[in-house]
């Protein structure tokens, strides 16, 4: 327990549960230890007592006891000289702007008791170099580490579900792994100009607007199959991006999503994509080929605006004309045949099972079937030479088998 004189330097209010909240401090500013109890009552909350450094410009260190469960709104906001913080092991919530603009704070340990961290909690802590969000944290507010320009390493706990603009302007951050607990990232890493590597977890469904805008060091990105939408400006200005893999569940690519990705040379659009926004690939100056695996998505004449290239589409897919997105179109041929996984002719018929073969003009194709993959006994059913873009095949004997598998090959 602190001496009586030291405790008298704090002002408290009594909470409904007979605990105390610190509301004011009048003592010397250098290093402060907040009492755990006073007059037999536990101190459980800190409410803006040091915020905006009102009379506390020299506060360099603070110890928060284990009795405290809540660090309130702007509790230490703009304590510019603060270099050391010890957070007690009972804190469950860190409020909005709690340590914002503590520009001398080099590191902070967030205990495993914390479950919620508010918006802008560590915004503009420009000396902060590392940060770890523990697995106990389920909710983080937007802009949590925004403008932490020295932050080079961050660990995101496995219970976080949403990341908003939490790392915007973290210009020293070089790599990040987004855990599988996260379902949405929205504007999270905008202007992280040193970010060279990112791993997106397999539960993310939305890569929101501006998420990786101006990440000019990012060279490759794999968007997992869990993602259904890529927002506007999501990768705008990623000038070093040379390779992007778009997952097979993406249905929409937003306006200007890959604008000014000046080192991107080709892109493959999966058959799940139904819409591409205006200028999605505007000024991708090295992009000369776009490969489409499915039917023609909706998109205006500006999709590839400003550059020259060709949009290639798979034979047998629908909706294509002689131009798409401002580019001429052409059939996409491959040296080996392929069974189209969607579109016309796939599935049971009145007298068998049918599918369409594509990508193998003017070469012979053998269709084989197997009733049991365990024994691997593949039997030839037909040999055809594709004289056009596609060939329709129907197995009239498929109804004689409880299950049947198919493959095609060139003899």
List the predicted regions and their residue ranges:
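Short, composition-biased motifs enriched in small/polar/acidic residues
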Residues: 3-24, 292-295, 301-302, 312-411
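Consensus positions within tandem repeat domains that build extended binding/scaffold surfaces
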Residues: 48-49, 72-77, 95-101, 118-123, ...
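Intrinsically disordered, low-complexity coil segments
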Residues: 51-58, 344-347
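Structural signature of tandem-repeat unit edges
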Residues: 15, 27-44, 55-70, 80-93, ...
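Hydrophobic residues on conserved beta-strands that form the core of alpha/beta folds
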Residues: 22, 43-46
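BRCT (BRCA1 C-terminal) domain core and associated BRCT-interaction motifs
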Residues: 305-307
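Glycine-centered signal
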Residues: 3-5, 115, 119
């Amino acid at each position: 327990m602190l001496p009586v004189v030291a405790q008298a330097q704090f002002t408290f209010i009594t909470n409904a549960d007979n605990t105390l909240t610190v509301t004011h401090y009048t003592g010397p500013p250098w290093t402060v230890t907040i009492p755990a109890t006073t007059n037999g009552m536990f101190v459980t909350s800190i409410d803006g007592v040091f915020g905006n450094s009102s009379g506390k410009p020299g506060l360099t260190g603070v110890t928060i006891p284990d009795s405290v469960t809540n660090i309130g709104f702007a509790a230490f906001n703009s304590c510019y000289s603060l270099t050391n913080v010890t957070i007690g092991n009972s804190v469950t919530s860190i409020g909005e702007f709690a340590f914002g603009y503590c520009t001398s704070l080099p590191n902070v340990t967030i205990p495993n008791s914390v479950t919620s961290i508010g918006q802008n909690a560590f915004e503009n802590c420009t000396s902060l170099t590392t940060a770890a969000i523990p697995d106990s944290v389920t909710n983080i507010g937007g802009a949590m580490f925004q403008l932490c320009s020295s932050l080079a390493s961050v660990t995101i706990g496995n219970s976080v579900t949403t990341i908003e603009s939490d790392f915007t302007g973290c210009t020293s951050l070089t790599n990040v792994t987004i855990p599988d607990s996260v379902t949405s990232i929205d504007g999270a890493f905008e202007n992280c100009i040193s970010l060279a590597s990112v791993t997106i977890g397999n539960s993310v469904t939305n890569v929101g607007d501006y998420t990786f805008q101006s990440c000019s060091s990012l060279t490759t990105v794999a968007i997992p199959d869990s993602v259904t939408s890529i927002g506007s400006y999501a990768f705008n200005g990623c000038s070093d991006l040379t390779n992007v893999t778009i997952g097979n569940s993406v249905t929409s690519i937003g306006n200007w999503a890959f604008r000014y990705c000046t080192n991107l040379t080709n892109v493959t659009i999966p058959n799940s994509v139904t819409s591409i926004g205006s200028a999605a690939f505007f000024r991708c100056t090295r992009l000369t080929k776009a490969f489409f695996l499915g039917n023609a998505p909706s998109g205006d004449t500006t999709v590839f605006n400003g550059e020259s290239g060709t949009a290639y589409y798979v034979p047998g897919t629908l909706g294509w004309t002689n131009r798409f997105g401002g580019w001429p179109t052409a059939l996409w041929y491959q040296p080996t045949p392929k069974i189209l996984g969607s579109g016309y002719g796939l599935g049971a018929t009145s007298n068998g099972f049918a599918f369409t073969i594509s990508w193998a003009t003017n070469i012979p194709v053998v269709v084989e079937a197997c009733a049991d993959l365990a024994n691997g006994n593949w039997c030839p059913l037909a040999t055809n030479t594709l004289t056009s873009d596609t060939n329709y095949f129907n197995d009239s004997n498929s109804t004689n088998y409880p299950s049947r598998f198919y493959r095609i090959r060139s003899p």
